[in-house]
Amino acid sequence: MALVHGHGTLTLAVIATAVWWLAVTIGIIGGAALLRTPDGSPVDRYGIPNGLTALRGYACVPVLLLGTLSLPGRLGLALWGCIGGSVGLLDAVDGIIARRYGPVTVLGKAMDPFGDALYFVVGAIGSWALGIVPLWLAILIVARYAGPVVLTPIVLLTGRRPELVYTVWGRRNTLFTGVVLFALYVVRLFGGPVEVVALIIALPTLVPTALLHFVALFQRVAASPRAG
């Protein structure tokens, strides 16, 4: 990176990564109060599932830099698939471990959707920068994942206390998003028509599931109790 962009860019990248890692660490430590099971029993450790979710959080800025800073030849595309894709797969692994081996915690239920939101936003931006997805699809993915994160504080300020967990359609949309991004990565890798393939596979899968996810979120908010 230093050879391509200069030492100044490398220094800024290191600083940005360090600041981000500090912010993630503070968030994880601050969330220790939520280390309890959904039925209220205290948990004395973060556990592997929460650790894997945290790892995705730590990886966001390095992966974003990997996608947006040009590298020689097809190196950026190759690293994006190897590193970005591998970290993204942790989303499936942490849930499986939590359900099978535990611990399932309130912290994990809150962190996992938030971690997904961060990582898929990074994935959308990096994929667009690398020519893996068209702009409209990147915007759709960013809106789908950033929207609930941005709206959650507003909902809480109204006094509503909805459960901060996935919706069924949100899980389905996340699965489809991962499949679409992988398919388009392969198309881009072999020089195929990314725009055409995106229209064929993303429109009928991501658009309706994203809309149904937001409908489910609004219904959850409307049915949620008020604080106090």
PLM regions and their residue ranges:
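A feature for the membrane-embedded catalytic helix bundles of lipid/isoprenoid biosynthetic enzymes
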Residues: 1-53, 57, 113-228
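Hydrophobic alpha-helical segments and helix pairs
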Residues: 41-83
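Hydrophobic membrane-targeting signal helices
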Residues: 65-68, 85, 89, 128-129, ...
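Membrane-helix interface segments
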Residues: 73-79, 107, 132-136, 193-194
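Hydrophobic transmembrane alpha-helices
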Residues: 82-90, 143-146
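Conserved G/P- and acidic residue-centered "switch" motifs that form tight phosphate/ATP-binding loops
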Residues: 91, 112
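Membrane-interface helix/loop boundary segments of multi-pass membrane proteins
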Residues: 95-103
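Amphipathic cytosolic juxtamembrane alpha-helices at the membrane-cytosol interface
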Residues: 103-109
